[in-house]
Amino acid sequence: MIQRDVLLRQIQQLTHALVRIAEMITNREFDRALEAIDEQLNMQLDGSAEGLRRIPPERLLALCHENGRFSAQAAQTLARLLRLQGDAHAGRDEDAAAGACYGRALLLLRAALQSDDATVSWKIGTHLAELQRLTDEHPPGDDVAGALQ
């Protein structure tokens, strides 16, 4: 139970940070947004923005498992983070990096929607459609494209 509480607290802290990061992207502060994403991933998940952008799809999905169960909440939070990271890369005209982020975000949202205990945002359909459009515009690498099939 303690492990789940820690995970939920990390997700909550990450969610608060996402609001600030989204504001940076709205203000076209792409470098600052990527630095903030990297900082949050380091603090909350002991990782990096580049690591999350390059993580193999199966390992990305495994990050959202706890005690053998898939956490739709964790998947949606990571998907939001990856979407923002993709937006920052797209703002810097880094199409390959943007595609890698968008593709992974789409993969996570699809998994969240298919989860047995899926408590998902009522806007998930809109988010899925938008991520599909962005993934079409900024194709992900072959590993993610294969996982999305």
Where are these regions (language model features)?
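Short coil/turn linking the two alpha-helices of tandem helical-hairpin repeats
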Residues: 22, 86-87, 93, 112-114, ...
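Residue at a conserved register position within TPR or TPR-like alpha-solenoid repeats
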Residues: 24, 82-85, 89, 109, ...
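N-terminal alpha-helical interaction modules that lie
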Residues: 1-75, 110-111, 133-149
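Start-of-helix signal in alpha-solenoid helical-repeat scaffolds, especially tetratricopeptide repeats
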Residues: 7-15, 72-80, 99, 103, ...
